[in-house]
Each structure stands twice: as C-alpha cells, then as structure tokens.
Amino acid sequence: MTATSDLIESLISYSWDDWQVTRQEARRVIAAIRNDNVPDATIAALDKSGSLIKLFQRVGPPELARSLIASIAGRTTMQRYQARNALIRSLINNPLGTQTDNWIYFPTITFFDICADLADAAGRLGFAAAGATGVASQAIQGPFSGVGATGVNPTDLPSIAFGDQLKLLNKDPATVTKYSNPLGDLGAYLSQLSPQDKLNQAQTLVGQPISTLFPDAYPGNPPSRAKVMSAAARKYDLTPQLIGAIILAEQRDQTRDEDAKDYQAAVSIKSANTSIGLGQVVVSTAIKYELFTDLLGQPVRRGLSRKAVATLLASDEFNIFATARYIRYVANLASQQDLRKLPKTRGAFPSIDLRAYAGNPRNWPRDNVRALASEYTSRPWDDNLSPGWPMFVDDAYATFLDPGMRFP
C-alpha cells in the first residue's frame, strides 16, 4: 500500500450511510493522484486490493471521470496496462462511460489511450512542463478574435443559433459574411497596425497556455503555445518563428464566429470538410497526411473517426504539430520540384531556392517563406499562387524575427 492508495480507498469506500462518492471526494481523489510521487505503486496497490475497478466505477460525473482517467493515463508507466484493463472491466455495466457532449466521438478506452500517448509524446518531445504564460485577448468579434487570440476553444463555443444555421444553409450574404474570414484587403488591415500592435498580437498568440482538451494528461499545468511550437520545430527541422508566423496570419483572419461555424459544421451530420484551429488545418488534410503521427500511436490513429479528428484539431497541441508536420511536408515536396516547370512561382519569388527547402528555414531566402505561405493554403506547387497571402505571412514572420519579440 501507499499513502495515496490508502487515502483513495477511504474516499471511495461505501458504508451504510455513505453510498456515493461526492464531487468533493472525487476532486480529492484526483488531486491525490496528480500529486502522487509513486503513481505506479499506488495503482498496483489499488489493483491488488480490488479497489482499482471501484475507483473507475465510483468517480463521476463524466467530466470528473475524464479528469481521473487522464491523470492516471498520463502518470503511469509500469502499471498503465493494469489501469487500462481495470477501466475496461469497469465499463461492463456502463458502456458509454465518459462519452458525453463533445466526447461522444471518443470511446472511454480511446480517451485513455489518447491521454497516455499524448503524455508520452510530451515527455519525449520536450513540451510536458508548463512554462511562463501571458494573457489572452478579450476580443469577441472582428479580426484576431478566434482561439489564437482568446484561448477560447472551438469546442466550448455556444451552438450557432438555429436561425443563423438556416441562413447559412440558404447562403444569406450577411450571415455568410458573419461566419467567414473577416479580412478582405489584407494589406489595408496590416496598415492599421503599428509595430507594437503586431508584437502584442504575436506575444498574445504564443504566450498563452495551450487551449487543450486534455489538460490532466500533463504533469502540471499545460505548457505554453511557444513551448509546443518550439518542440514541433525541433521535431520537423523548422523554426518556431516560421510556425508562429503561419499561425498568426491564419488567426488574424479568424473570428470566434468562424471558429464556431467551422467546428460545428465538421461534427454535424454533414461532416463538412472545414479548416479548424490555430493553423486552420483542413480535416481531410489531417487524415490524408496523418498529421497526428508524432503525438499518437498507430493503433489510436487507426481508430479515430472523422469527427474525432476534427475535435482533436481544436486542441492546440494537436493543431500545432499538425501545422508543423504539414509545413515540413510542403517544404520537402518543394525540394523535389523543377523550378523551370513553375514559371509563375519563379516570377513571383525570384530569389526562391527550392533545394534549400530540405533544410532549416534559418537558411532559406526570404522568398522561400513567402512561397511556402502561398502553398500552405492551397494545393502545393501547382503554380497557382494565393494573391496577397505570401506578403501577409511574411509580415507576421518579420514580427517574430523582431528583436522586441519575446518567444518564451
């Protein structure tokens, strides 16, 4: 036995006048697990005494059960298999388990496995520990009012009013505009921002803690976006500044209303193929290019539904890694192209060096950044360019390279 297992058994035990685990007791159980220095020994002791199954059966409601499951999955190693088996047995009389609300797309065991894989990846890739974090924006509408600015997760936004849903279905111009990208003239928007405004936006984006669906899978508080971007940059031989620039550009042209529309459409009966989250990753792109490969093992990825993929894209760490992995894919693809067959690209970006894309962006000509920005948002290297977007991303990149920019 351990001190934590003794405490947990006392909190989940029933008596003649105590036939349920209260919310307060459940929170004490979860806190004990999260603060335990020997979690594997505690799980082994609970398993040996027959209390491990009871733990999973008795701690609720679903949001607290998920917190419990994530805390155990993220902290165990030697005893993770035993914990998973106990969880399976606990679901015999409650097959839905934690599948409520947005979690309907994740069977309880899948949720356990995602938390376990994420915790392992965070430790392996160096973004498990929390870092210094900044303050979110309070903007609720207009440019730069989506998750990148506010930290409000798309899955937490209210359902779009039924009247607006009908108007969107009928393509009412005013309603479509309300739920679409807010910027028309990208250059005009940038001209309204001072250098300090741009720095403030960039710092707001990267300084916040990640907006994650799996906070309890981390050993402490979730890490900052800057920390996750830095980890993704190391993994894919990129720079955090390039990842940050791509995301900042996407988030400048994003609103809270559009976040709501894109996510809710993706998980609706239509399963719309929308772009979701920080890097505005398209659901089909995440699936086709297996953009979660470095955070989730193949068994988990293979079992994800399309709506589960859409939901994971709303979680910052998954979106940042998906964005970075796709940037690297587009860059590697460029290094294999023949510039003579891309006359429009060569004309628009005269300093482009396709071979340089195989290496780190620190060694790219600036035109490489601009060209990649165009190809990130469309079919890559088909010689059809995205008007205005290369310079829009380049402006964000310049902000991240500014000496006044603090990248935690």
UniProtKB/Swiss-Prot annotation:
Which Pfam family, an example, fits this chain? T6SS_Tse3_cat
Q: Where in the cell is it found?
A: Host membrane; Secreted
Mutating D18A: what's the consequence?
A: Significant loss of membrane-binding affinity
Listed GO molecular functions?
A: lysozyme activity; metal ion binding
Recorded protein name is Peptidoglycan muramidase Tse3
Per the entry, what this protein does is: Toxin secreted by the H1 type VI (H1-T6SS) secretion system into the periplasm of recipient cells. Degrades peptidoglycan via muramidase activity thereby helping itself to compete with other bacteria. To protect itself, the bacterium synthesizes immunity protein Tsi3 that specifically interacts with and inactivates cognate toxin.
**What reaction gets catalysed by this protein?**
Hydrolysis of (1->4)-beta-linkages between N-acetylmuramic acid and N-acetyl-D-glucosamine residues in a peptidoglycan and between N-acetyl-D-glucosamine residues in chitodextrins
The subunit field of the Swiss-Prot or TrEMBL record says:
Forms a heterotetramer with Tsi3 consisting of two Tse3 dimers and two Tsi3 dimers. Formation of the complex inactivates Tse3 enzymatic activity.
Task: Mention any one GO cellular component term assigned to this protein in its UniProt record.
Answer: host cell membrane
* Intrachain disulfide bonds: none
Query: Which of this chain's residues are annotated to bind Ca(2+) 1?
Result: N181, D253, Q254, E258
Q: Which residues bind Ca(2+) 2?
A: E375, S378, R379, D382, N384
According to the lineage, what is the superkingdom?
Bacteria
For this protein's source organism, the top of the classification is:
Bacteria, Pseudomonadati, Pseudomonadota, Gammaproteobacteria, Pseudomonadales
The cofactors required by this protein are: Ca(2+)
UniProt effect for mutating D262A: Complete loss of enzymatic activity
Q: State the UniProt keywords alphabetically.
A: Calcium, Host membrane, Hydrolase, Membrane, Metal-binding, Secreted
